[in-house]
Design a protein with these regions (language model features):
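PAS-family sensory domain signal
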Residues: 13-66, 112-114
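Generic recognition of flexible, low-complexity loop/linker segments
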Residues: 11-15, 25, 83-85, 95, ...
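PAS/GAF/H-NOX family sensory domains and closely associated sensor/linker modules
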Residues: 55, 59-78, 83-88
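Interdomain signal-transducing alpha-helical coiled-coil linkers
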Residues: 1-12
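Extracellular Ig-like/FN3 beta-sandwich strand-entry sites
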Residues: 91-93
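PAS-family sensory domains
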Residues: 95-103
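Conserved acidic
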Residues: 1, 126-127
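Short loop/turn elements at sensory-signaling interfaces that couple input to output
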Residues: 108-126
Length: 127
């Protein structure tokens, strides 16, 4: 039990160290549109609460508030889960970038979570 607690503390410390580079890390189940956040800003967690746990609805709220108008199509494209699934099923990753209204460039990389569950994917946002 003590080792498990220490491993949890180590993981939390590691996340704190790398957090400035990572804007968010999510595990998404495309079949349910539900997600787990590994690392998320409080604003996104609030959107998730308002959207009752729907990742796509929370992302649309985020898009409308933060994403520059010229890049909203990028968000819409990745919210097409069939498109994302087809890219991942072909052995590739989805790798897109968009700008926030404040000019910050955000990179989103989407990968398969595992080979055993085709519905799960990892969404990593970096700046």
């Amino acid at each position: 039990m003590n080792q498990l607690l220490q491993e949890k503390r180590d993981a939390e410390q590691f996340l704190r160290l790398i957090a400035p580079k990572y804007m968010g890390v999510y595990i998404l189940n495309r079949s349910t549109d539900r997600f787990r956040d590994v690392l998320a800003p409080e604003a996104f967690r609030a959107y998730a609460k308002v959207s009752e746990g729907s990742y796509s609805d929370a992302m649309r709220l985020y898009r409308d508030e933060y994403v520059s108008c010229d890049y909203r199509e990028v968000i819409d494209q990745v919210l097409d889960y069939d498109y994302v699934y087809n890219v991942l099923a072909s052995g590739n990753q989805v790798d897109v970038s968009y700008r926030k209204k404040d000019g910050t460039l955000i990179r989103l990389k989407i990968s398969r979570y595992s080979d055993s569950d085709e519905n799960l994917s990892v969404w990593v946002y970096t700046n």
